[in-house]
Amino acid sequence: MTTILNEKTDRTVKNIHLMVTPLCDRKCPNCCNNLYTLNEIPYATEDELKQCERLFLTGGEPFRYTAVDDLAEYYKKRYPNIKQVIVYGNAYDCERYIMKGGTFNYIDGLSLSIKSKKDKECMESMVRDYEFEGLKHNRLYVFDNLMPTGVEIPNFAIYNRAWQSLDEYKPADDSIFRKMC
């Protein structure tokens, strides 16, 4: 497999996408995680984390398989240079996380995806029942025209997305991808 991971530079180390779990129950077409093997992804080093300013918790599915707020608290307290922690996940598992008492005390933003009707329904429910006011850096990626209806979606920048072929996929050029030790 050819790696597409960005090189560590003074610029890219400021934004670390940290795979906190490889586990996911979905089989999304053209999932970017199919572009590399787990062994290709380097572990985040102490030096990298000491230079990081924005940490993106990703997976797999972080809301399903990790305690994301506990992870955010750990990284922010251990590395005071980390100013923002943003969690990537799907709307269904985010709603389940909230319903189980999950909190966002140390999380600064969400990057949620709607990739199924179940995700769409969960996002509609979440914005009716939960206020995302404390989360300032939120994005909602909507696939397959599954835009939530009948609700306002405040505090989220909304992006309509199409599935990219794996040949077209490019990681953000201002970040590095690492896995958690």
Predicted regions span which residues?
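N-terminal [4Fe-4S]-dependent radical SAM core
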Residues: 1-18, 156-181
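Leucine-rich repeat
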Residues: 45-50, 73-78, 101-103
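Short low-complexity stretches enriched in small and charged residues
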Residues: 9-15, 62-70
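Core AdoMet radical
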Residues: 32-40, 52-65, 81-96, 106-141
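Conserved strand-turn element in the central/C-terminal portion of the radical SAM core barrel
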Residues: 112, 117, 131-171
